[in-house]
Amino acid sequence: MMMTEMTEEQTIYPPEAPTNCDLCPRLVAYRSKNRLEHPGWFNAPVPSFGDKAAKLLVIGLAPGVTGANKTGRPFTGDWAGDLLYATLSKFGYSEGEYQARPDDGLELKDAMITNAVRCVPPKNKPVGTEVNTCR
């Protein structure tokens, strides 16, 4: 059996989920339903946003159905994002103006935002196995 050694970066920063991750059947079914209902939305595992070597890490539970699931950026497009990005700006963790869309030019400074579960769950409630699978 051939073993592949992981680089130091791979052990510190886990890889992002593939666009068509199929590890959680309930989330795959919900994502498929959303893709049919909203074909113009992101509807995929939402990648982390920001600096991998950040001093501040913000971890949400999961993408919101009409927020990050729609836009493809954590906490973007919903009221929680309005509050979070205003707070990050106030304390100097961002540059640019948050406009609730991923192409607004906003950049994080020494901060990173991610979710415990990368795919949007039904009723915004992931189950324990989904959290563990998405590590």
Task: Annotate each predicted stretch with a short phrase.
Residues 8-135:
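A polyanion-binding, active-site-adjacent surface
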Residues 1-5:
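Residue-level detector of intrinsically disordered terminal segments
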